[in-house]
Structure formats: structure tokens, C-alpha cells
Amino acid sequence: MPKNPFVVRLAEPRDEAVIAGLVVEGFLDKFRPIFGRRMDQSVKIMEKWVRLEHSLGGVSSLVVEGHAPAEILASIGVRIGNSDDGALTRGLWKVLRRNLGYTRASWAATLLSYPRYTAISYEAYIERLVVTHEHRHQGMACALLEAAESLSREFDKETVGLHVSDDNLPALRLYEARGYKESSRQHSLLTSYFLGIREWLYLQKEL
């Protein structure tokens, strides 16, 4: 892993609940329309989703530690292994239905399916990069991207890709500064209306 002024390490099972909380906090404006009145279930659902990604989705997570190992200040997920997409989808649906009920689960599953991504064997896929609000602008996001790219190289990936919403200008500037370039776009009337996301940009970088 690259050297940084703070500790970047691979996440452990004990970190999954904290990662889930970070993700919900970091994307709160996107999760509210998805979970609605069941927002109180969002962290529990996300924790189980992160666990499913780790066990079935070929995803590894990296975290930035605070002063104590249990204190997580930032996190990122990177898909570098093989994913059992069928089992992953069934697992997520079971979690959603159990915690939200059938109708809300169907709605949540539809919105959570965006942006669409098809795995490529030679490419790593980065997701859910989040930094706690009070620790932003300290280089943690760059450090996590650097570590994720390094891990991807260890798994012989040739490129790394990620999605970002067209209105997330700080993230776009960060990725462009790191050498990511736009490869394609997805337009969704559904996410445009309900999440305020008109387009999803797919960015790639050669490793």
C-alpha cells in the first residue's frame, strides 16, 4: 500500500457496521427518497449489503483509521474478484424485503440498480468512496483512491472504473485530477426525477 500521513488498511468484518454508517451519511440525500419513512433501517440494510459484497461480490474495502483502530474516518470499495451476481441480487432482495416490506423493497431495489455496470475481467470497479464531513479536504479520498489502484494492480487489473453523478462537481474534479477520463454516460428519467441525478458518468483510468 502507498505511504500516507494516516493509516490506510484493508477493512475487516468488524468494520462493516461503521462503513455502512459512513455510506448512509455520505449519500444521505440519495438514500432518503429510496428508503422514505423506513430511513431508520438504512444503516442496517447497508451493513448487510456491504457484508454481501465482501462475501459474494468480489469486493474488498479499504478504510482510513482514526486515532483508534475502531475509529474509521473514510472508506472505499473496490471490486477486484469474481462476483456471484445472482446470489448477490437474491441476497439484497431478501434483506430489502425483510426490512422494508414488499412494496418499498421493490421501489428501493429499482433505484439501487442505478447506475448499471457490467463487470470486465481486466478492470477493477471502485464504489462508495466516502469521507466523514469533518475530515474532508485532508487528502483521505486521494489516499484511498491511490490504495485502491495499488490493490487493483496487485490483482493484475489493467484499468479501473467508477461511476459519478453529473452534478457531483467536487468528485469529478478529484477523479479528473487523478487521471480518470470519461468513457460513457447513462441517462435515467427515473433517477433524474426521484434522485435529482440526470446522468451518470463512467470514468476510467489505465493502471
Model-flagged regions — what are they?
Residues 4-6, 69-75, 124:
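Glycine-rich phosphate/pyrophosphate-binding loop shared by adenosine-nucleotide-utilizing enzymes
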